[in-house]
From Swiss-Prot:
Further information: Heme 1 (or BH or b566) is high-potential and absorbs at about 566 nm, and heme 2 (or BL or b562) is low-potential and absorbs at about 562 nm.
Chain positions recorded as heme c binding sites: C35
KW Transcription regulation (keyword) present: no
Membrane spanning stretches: 32-52, 90-110, 116-136, 186-206
Family from the record: Belongs to the cytochrome b family. PetB subfamily.
Protein name: Cytochrome b6
Lineage: Eukaryota, Viridiplantae, Streptophyta, Embryophyta, Tracheophyta
Role this protein plays: Component of the cytochrome b6-f complex, which mediates electron transfer between photosystem II (PSII) and photosystem I (PSI), cyclic electron flow around PSI, and state transitions.
SUPFAM superfamilies for the chain: Transmembrane di-heme cytochromes
Native source organism of the sequence: Gossypium hirsutum
Superkingdom of origin organism: Eukaryota
């Protein structure tokens, strides 16, 4: 085993990387509330894992979506547990994100030189809300259908561009297969990719600038 480690150490300098990670200075004022961002990340990772597991059974069509969710909950091995964990971690992610935003704001973590860290955090907040909207529609039940119909219908009040914007969101004039396909693609590919990119930017900035000091 030591020879394998030495082989990687010689080429990648693993020990230097580990020392840099473990020796990072942590200010003495840091408390449990500074863990809220990390908990949000953990919830996101749980979402990715459980969501990926459900893609093996979920069918993104208006005729089969609801039945496939029923199959996950009643027949697939541990499907009920995987979907329940997905829902619980989604709620937890939103709650932890909100508390994290309050903590950062109340401790002045958005001030110079951390403005860009705050901006990436705001983008992550928008992406998290988008996860909720798109995911809500996927079971294709009554609640999801009417929620999507209302949310996508909001831009219609905008003069001139309102109706085209609604059609862009829905993929057609009404909520149907095109809407479900778009929301499924957003929920399972586009939003996770964007979230991963902005999380990486967010953490690299924190890593570079360190944790903000006390007020």
């Amino acid at each position: 085993m030591s020879k394998v480690y030495d082989w990687f150490e010689e080429r990648l300098e693993i020990q230097a990387i580990a020392d840099d990670i473990t020796s990072k200075y942590v200010p003495p004022h840091v408390n449990i509330f500074y863990c809220l961002g990390g908990i949000t990340l953990t919830c996101f990772l749980v979402q990715v894992a459980t969501g990926f597991a459900m893609t093996f059974y979920y069918r993104p069509t208006v005729t089969e979506a609801f039945a496939s969710v029923q199959y996950i909950m009643t027949e697939a091995n541990f499907g009920w547990l995987i979907r329940s964990v997905h829902r619980w971690s989604a709620s937890m992610m939103v709650l932890m994100m909100i508390l994290h935003v309050f903590r950062v704001y109340l401790t002045g973590g958005f001030k110079k030189p951390r403005e860009l860290t705050w901006v990436t955090g705001v983008v992550l907040g928008v992406l998290t809300a988008s996860f909720g909207v798109t995911g809500y529609s996927l079971p294709r039940d009554q609640i999801g259908y009417w929620a999507v119909k209302i949310v996508t219908g909001v831009p219609e009040a905008i003069p001139v561009i309102g109706s085209p914007l609604v059609e862009l969101l829905r993929g057609s004039a009404s909520v149907g297969q095109s809407t479900l396909t778009r929301f499924y693609s957003l929920h399972t590919f586009v939003l996770p990719l964007l979230t991963a990119v902005f999380m990486l930017m967010h953490f690299l900035m924190i890593r570079k600038q360190g944790i903000s000091g006390p007020l």
